[in-house]
């Protein structure tokens, strides 16, 4: 629609690194600049991308999670688990945030502190993120932390922890919205 209306440029924040490839290629063939925000697409058909180094951001999230777990009095000699929630594994930003988190965790977390095997995908739905967080807490008796890789996940985790009055759980999340 923007192209038909004579846009001088297109600004996109891709939630899926694949879904906009064809559209960006068509726009670029018309010599209209494409600027990406926050995530790359799986193509070189864009002019510039302004984004966070999401691997580094994931590492910082893991570092913060470890600090908060230690500060909460969790012993490195006792087993504990941390869960991960994200909106989509089709977003390179999400993939990189998880990758950075897992890499840092593998290097620096006590050996008895583990990441749960199931990473929950909520599809950008806050209610699903709430449900996923509640299931994670119910399923894992050793859960002491939850990492939300995006706003939807962070909001869902915060709502669940608040509803359940779970002050014993450490939460680290991205993209803080007003409701969190």
Each model region followed by its residue ranges:
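A residue-level marker of the well-folded mature domains of exported/periplasmic proteins
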Residues: 1-180
């Amino acid at each position: 629609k923007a192209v038909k209306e004579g846009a001088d440029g297109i600004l996109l924040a891709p939630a899926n690194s694949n879904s906009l490839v064809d559209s960006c290629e068509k726009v670029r063939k018309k010599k209209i600049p494409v600027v990406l925000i926050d995530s790359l697409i799986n193509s070189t058909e864009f002019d510039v991308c302004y984004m966070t180094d999401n691997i580094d951001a994931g590492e910082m999230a893991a570092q913060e999670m470890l600090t908060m777990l230690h500060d909460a009095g969790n012993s490195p000699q006792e087993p504990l688990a941390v869960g991960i929630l994200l909106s989509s594994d089709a977003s390179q930003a999400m993939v990189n945030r998880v990758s950075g988190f897992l890499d840092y965790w593998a290097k620096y977390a006590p050996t008895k502190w583990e990441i749960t095997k199931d990473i929950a995908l909520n599809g950008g739905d806050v209610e699903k993120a709430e449900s996923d967080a509640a299931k994670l807490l119910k399923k894992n008796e050793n859960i002491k932390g939850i990492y939300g890789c995006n706003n939807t996940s962070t909001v869902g985790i915060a709502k669940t922890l608040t509803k359940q009055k779970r002050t014993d759980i450490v939460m680290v999340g991205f993209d803080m919205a007003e409701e969190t």
